[in-house]
């Protein structure tokens, strides 16, 4: 009987200590919602874009460089981005992209010969692609859209976004 009582006492003390530790963690998360809960591998992917606009980007009719407005999108698939024209995408983005649009991550104007960091963006669940749409003045000649593959969970990705004369490029930075 003494053994059973001793075992019971040890079990109750162990549960009490575990409850205290759990309560402390819950308090920490409530007091600071930015605290990570869970391992890195199960956290949403974060993506940053280091954007550089070339000195000769987006030349106007007088040959002078002009700012470029870029929009960053989180997508489950990029097939619709490459199927529609610029104005169909930008004028009614949610309707045109439908369920493939996981999130519109934002729009930014980038001036010629400048560097700017976009993000970090936390990707929503189901994101398979990051796409960039760039508003070049001559949309007929320019390569104004690009995309790259991403995972929606467990990564912290850095991309180089190059805004060249008449072309937008998105390149994953390794390392």
Describe each PLM feature range.
Residues 62-71:
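Short coil-to-beta strand junction motifs in C2/discoidin
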Residues 22-25, 145-150, 155-175:
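Glycine-rich, aromatic-bearing surface loops/beta-hairpins
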Residues 14-40:
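Bacterial Sec signal peptide processing site at the extreme N-terminus
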